[in-house]
């Protein structure tokens, strides 16, 4: 079952002409280093050499370590003194390159929909930039780093894209198997190669890159609009609890009283635990309690008597001592959003009320929740 979606960034989620980006990037960087008395051509050559080394990295070091090793050994005068200057460029001037890009509302919509439905999302962008630069490129696409469960950068990657090692490392970090993933990108060579690992793929044909004129007719493909429709058709992975609104739950306005939504959250959470095979009754018999620390609810549209709603639930955080659950209430017939919310809980020893770490005291319950986080 598919539970993980990997996206390329440039030319996929972000509108970008790759050649124009490289030209603009080196033009701005060259101007900065020239203003400090350095030869831009020499520095650009050293950057290309370091980038090439990252693409061939064998996993023995991070791409960051690989890049600077080659850069420092490039023969540049005062090569080590250039690092603060390059750091300054990424922190202060790199963002001006956004002028050649534009955000895409569809990207925001797709990511939001996938997160809402419980999918793990990885940004499998070429890990040759530092995190600060990658996060800026994410912002250019109208997205945020928090939209992704993993973002590959030169700090956290040990291989270059599209090596098999790169993708296997991505899968390992996300805790996903190849057959559970879809890789989405606009590069026939660097993105579609994941099919050989057992992943499903989708080729975005806007800003298509096909350096070797490879026949790509066999791949699922289309525009970003086509992709949005393709992803929208993916099933909702969240646990779903069906509930008919009762007459006694309404208020004098004829709609469900606001406090009852909190009760529905609890009903859904209890049903979810039963579904996992370790209900609240079993947990209490094991001597564990799970009191509520916080609960929040936002109301979007009213529910009336006899309406049937679905309360969809997802585990969003688990530390071994605490967990956080998100909820979404929608009309079963129309899909209209009624309410959203979340609750946070801790774990305590019922006999004493003292906090406990499930990893130490109840590893079976701990692993149960860990498994849900890996989904």
Predicted regions span which residues?
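Active-site neighborhood of HAD-like aspartate-dependent phosphohydrolases
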Residues: 1-46
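Asp-based, Mg2+/Mn2+-dependent phosphohydrolase catalytic module
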Residues: 1-5, 112, 126-128, 135-238
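Hydrophobic "anchor" residues
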Residues: 12-13, 256, 337, 355
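A metal-dependent, Asp-based hydrolase signature
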Residues: 41-91
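Short, acidic loop-to-helix structural element flanking the phosphoryl-transfer center
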Residues: 61-65, 80-84, 88-123
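Hot-dog-fold acyl-thioester-processing enzymes
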Residues: 236-294, 350-375
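HotDog/MaoC-like acyl-thioester-processing domains
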Residues: 237-241, 299, 303-305, 316-375
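Hydrophobic beta-strand-centered segment that forms part of the acyl-chain substrate-binding groove
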Residues: 272-323
């Amino acid at each position: 079952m598919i539970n993980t979606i990997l996206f390329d960034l440039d030319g996929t989620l972000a509108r970008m002409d790759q050649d124009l980006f490289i030209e603009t990037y080196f033009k701005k960087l060259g101007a900065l280093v020239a203003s400090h008395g350095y030869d831009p051509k020499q520095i650009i050559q050293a950057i290309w050499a370091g980038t090439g080394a990252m693409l061939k990295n064998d996993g023995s070091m991070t791409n960051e370590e690989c890049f600077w090793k080659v850069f420092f050994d490039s023969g540049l005068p005062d090569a080590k003194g250039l690092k603060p200057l390059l750091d300054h460029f990424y922190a202060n001037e790199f963002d001006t390159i956004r002028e050649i890009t534009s955000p895409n509302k569809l990207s925001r919509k797709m990511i939001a929909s996938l997160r809402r439905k419980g999918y793990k999302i990885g940004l499998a962008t070429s890990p040759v930039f530092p995190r600060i630069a990658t996060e800026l490129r994410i912002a250019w696409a109208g997205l945020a780093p928090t939209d992704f469960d993993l973002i590959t950068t030169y700090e956290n990657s040990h291989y270059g894209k599209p090596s098999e090692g790169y993708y296997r490392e991505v899968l390992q970090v996300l805790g996903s198997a190849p057959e559970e993933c879809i890789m989405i990108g606009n590069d026939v060579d660097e993105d579609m190669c994941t099919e050989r690992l057992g992943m499903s793929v989708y080729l975005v044909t806007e800003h298509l890159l096909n350096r070797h004129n490879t026949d790509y007719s066999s791949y699922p493909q289309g525009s970003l609009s086509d992709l949005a429709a393709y992803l929208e058709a993916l099933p909702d992975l969240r646990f779903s609890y069906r509930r008919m609104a009762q007459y006694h739950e309404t208020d004098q306005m004829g709609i469900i009283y606001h406090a009852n939504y909190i009760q529905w959250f609890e009903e859904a959470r209890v049903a979810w635990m039963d579904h996992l095979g370790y209900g609240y009754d079993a947990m209490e018999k094991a001597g564990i309690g799970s009191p509520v620390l916080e609960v929040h609810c936002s109301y979007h549209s009213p529910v009336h008597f006899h309406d049937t709603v679905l309360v969809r639930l997802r585990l969003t955080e688990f530390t071994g001592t605490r967990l956080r659950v998100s909820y979404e209430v929608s009309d079963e017939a129309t899909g209209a959003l009624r309410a959203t919310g979340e609750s946070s809980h801790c774990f305590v020893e019922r006999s004493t009320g003292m906090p406990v770490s499930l990893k130490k005291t109840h590893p079976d319950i701990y692993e149960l929740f860990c498994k849900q986080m890996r989904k």
